[in-house]
C-alpha cells in the first residue's frame, strides 16, 4: 500500500480509523482545515475523489477501477491488489483528490 506521507503536494491531514466489524476497518484521510475525506483505505481497496471525465476514462481502461461506494459519482474505488495502476499514477490520483476536496 502507498505511504501517503511521502506524496508531495499533500497538505495537513487527519487520519481516522473506523472499525466496521470484528475483522475489517477503514482508514479515512481528511483535510485538516475542512474535515472532509479525500482518501478512504479499506482492506482491499482505496477510494478517492476525481472528476467525472477522468473517472469514466479510468473505469473503462482498468478492470480494477469502479465507482466509489463512499464518494459515489465523482469518486473511484481501486482494488489495491490488482496493481494495474503504476504507483506514480496512484500518487497523482491521491494528489488530485486532495486538491478537489480542499476546494469544497
Regions found by a protein language model. Give the residues of each.
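Charge-dense, helix-prone N-terminal extensions
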Residues: 1-104
Amino acid at each position: 500500500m502507498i505511504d501517503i506521507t511521502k506524496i508531495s503536494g499533500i497538505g495537513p491531514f487527519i487520519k481516522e480509523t473506523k472499525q466496521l466489524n470484528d475483522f475489517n476497518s477503514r482508514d479515512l484521510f481528511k483535510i485538516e482545515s475542512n474535515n472532509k475525506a479525500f482518501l478512504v483505505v479499506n482492506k482491499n481497496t482505496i477510494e478517492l475523489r476525481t472528476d467525472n471525465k477522468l473517472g469514466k476514462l479510468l473505469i473503462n481502461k482498468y478492470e480494477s477501477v469502479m465507482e466509489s461506494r463512499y464518494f459515489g459519482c465523482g469518486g473511484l474505488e481501486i482494488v489495491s491488489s490488482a496493481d494495474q495502476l503504476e504507483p506514480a499514477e496512484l500518487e497523482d490520483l491521491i494528489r488530485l483528490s486532495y486538491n478537489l476536496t480542499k476546494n469544497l
